């Protein structure tokens, strides 16, 4: 549970950093530029904490996929960036991949539990 909380914080920090990157105007706006550095530093710190209890493949896929989806939503709703069928299909594939990677982790845990019970 603690790992998932750190992962959620990593995702939100990464989305914050990405949003500030857009607002930093090529790092020429000091406050958003500082937000980029703080956001990404916090994101990698929280991600590393989450990896103490979560598998790398599942945590990284969740972090990257969810961050991508949220950043695309912010781009569309805040910055009026285009959102079309190709974008929707791409995001659906990314999110589907995250679910598949996480289901692999669940299946492995179930198999391990069954082996433990059988022995």
Curated annotation (Swiss-Prot):
GO molecular function: transmembrane transporter activity
Keyword flag Transmembrane: yes
Localization of this protein: Cell membrane
Major place of residence: membrane
UniProt keyword annotations, A-Z: Cell membrane, Membrane, Transmembrane, Transmembrane helix, Transport
GO terms under cellular component: plasma membrane
InterPro entries assigned to the protein according to its UniProt record, in alphabetical order: Small_drug/metabolite_transptr (IPR000390), Small_multidrug_res (IPR045324)
Annotated transmembrane regions: 3-23, 31-51, 59-79, 81-101
Bilayer topology: Multi-pass membrane protein
Subunit structure of this chain's protein: The efflux pump is composed of EbrA and EbrB.
Function: Part of a multidrug efflux pump. Confers resistance to cationic lipophilic dyes such as ethidium bromide, acriflavine, pyronine Y and safranin O. The efflux is probably coupled to an influx of protons.
Family membership: Belongs to the drug/metabolite transporter (DMT) superfamily. Small multidrug resistance (SMR) (TC 2.A.7.1) family. EbrA/EbrB subfamily.
Stated name of the protein: Multidrug resistance protein EbrB
Organism: Bacillus licheniformis (strain ATCC 14580 / DSM 13 / JCM 2505 / CCUG 7422 / NBRC 12200 / NCIMB 9375 / NCTC 10341 / NRRL NRS-1264 / Gibson 46)
Gene: ebrB
